[in-house]
Amino acid sequence: MFMTYQPKKRQRKKEHGFRKRMSTQSGRNILRKRRQKGRKKLTA
């Protein structure tokens, strides 16, 4: 048995990063909602 979460900075940014969010309409919606809510961190 080993830990299933093997964090990688590059992979995380590629999947959940700002540019990835901006690239799709639904991603932009996510950012808009998070801005409305007042999140300090919008993306990973």
Curated annotation (Swiss-Prot):
Gene: rpmH
Database matches in InterPro entries: Ribosomal_bL34, Ribosomal_bL34_CS
One cellular component (GO) term of this entry: ribonucleoprotein complex
Biased composition regions of type Basic residues, renumbered to the chain: 7-22, 30-44
Protein name in the entry: Large ribosomal subunit protein bL34
Entry keyword Ribosomal protein: yes
HAMAP family in UniProt: Ribosomal_bL34
UniProt keyword terms in alphabetical order: Ribonucleoprotein, Ribosomal protein
One Pfam entry name: Ribosomal_L34
Molecular function in Gene Ontology: structural constituent of ribosome
PANTHER family the UniProt entry points to: LARGE RIBOSOMAL SUBUNIT PROTEIN BL34M, MITOCHONDRIAL RIBOSOMAL PROTEIN 34 FAMILY MEMBER
Family: Belongs to the bacterial ribosomal protein bL34 family.
GO BP terms: translation
Highest taxon above the source species: Bacteria
The UniProt record lists the keyword Ribosomal protein: yes
Region (Disordered): 1-44
TM stretches of this protein: none
